[in-house]
């Protein structure tokens, strides 16, 4: 008889204690629940994005496979057409009609020859092959090319060669140090010309006099 009221008292006391504990921890329970809810929503979004990406990847793979298959088909068609062209035995199949009378034959030359060279034309009426080549300027060997030397007359105002005397009749300009003077008077202001002494010049004059005397003696003999 005593056990029944004891059990009821313990049950009531336990429920009250549990309710009190839950009341105290209600804030923590709410925060945990909210955090779990947020985590679940994020997981759902990640799963949905992964599923969409997987679908897009499968679509892109299928598109790539379709593109590759289309390229292979085009290559097969090109190979077939090339084989048909190569297997063609008739030479007329590879000719190009320029107009009604002339037929242009396929060029067997190198690409550089075709750029700088000629084109072969076949005339159907005369059955003759004529090569039309680009005109080039050729200098004949008989033609003489004037060379710029000392004898050529040039405009002194436009003399470009400092080593050539374009005016032999007049005295050379002092501004050009590379042209030798015709007389024996050497300029002192020109550092490039060799300065001869008076003894050297007198010696040259004496040599000329001796040469004149010897020539006169020889003529008398």
Swiss-Prot record:
Modified how: Phosphorylated on Tyr-112 and Tyr-132. Phosphorylations activate the host ARP2-ARP3 complex and lead to actin nucleation.
Keyword Transcription regulation tagged: no
Extracellular compartment residues: 1
Subcellular location, principal: host cell
InterPro entries per record: Orthopox_A36R
Location of the protein in the cell: Host cell membrane
Domain of life according to the entry: Viruses
Result of changing residue 112 to F: About 85% loss of virus-induced actin tail formation
Protein's membrane topology: Single-pass membrane protein
Regions crossing the membrane: 2-22
Cytoplasmic topological domain residue ranges: 23-221
Keywords associated with the record: Host cell membrane, Host membrane, Host-virus interaction, Membrane, Phosphoprotein, Transmembrane, Transmembrane helix
Residues annotated with Phosphotyrosine modification: 112, 132
Motif (NPF-motif): 161-163, 176-178, 190-192
GO cellular component terms attached to this protein's record: host cell; host cell plasma membrane; membrane
GO biological process: actin-dependent intracellular transport of virus; symbiont-mediated cell-to-cell migration in host; viral release from host cell
Coiled-coil portions: none
Family: Belongs to the orthopoxvirus A36 protein family.
Assembly: Interacts with host NCK. Interacts with protein OPG161 (via C-terminus). Interacts with protein OPG056. Interacts (via C-terminus) with host kinesin light chain/KLC1. Interacts with host intersectin-1/ITSN1 and EPS15.
Function: Involved in the intracellular transport and egress of virions to the host cell surface with help of protein OPG056. Also participates in the formation of actin tails at the plasma membrane to allow efficient actin-based motility and thus cell to cell transmission of viral particles. Recruits host intersectin-1/ITSN1 and activates host CDC42 to drive ARP2/3-mediated actin polymerization.
Protein name: Protein OPG164
Organism listed in the record: Vaccinia virus (strain Western Reserve) (VACV)
Gene name tied to this protein: OPG164
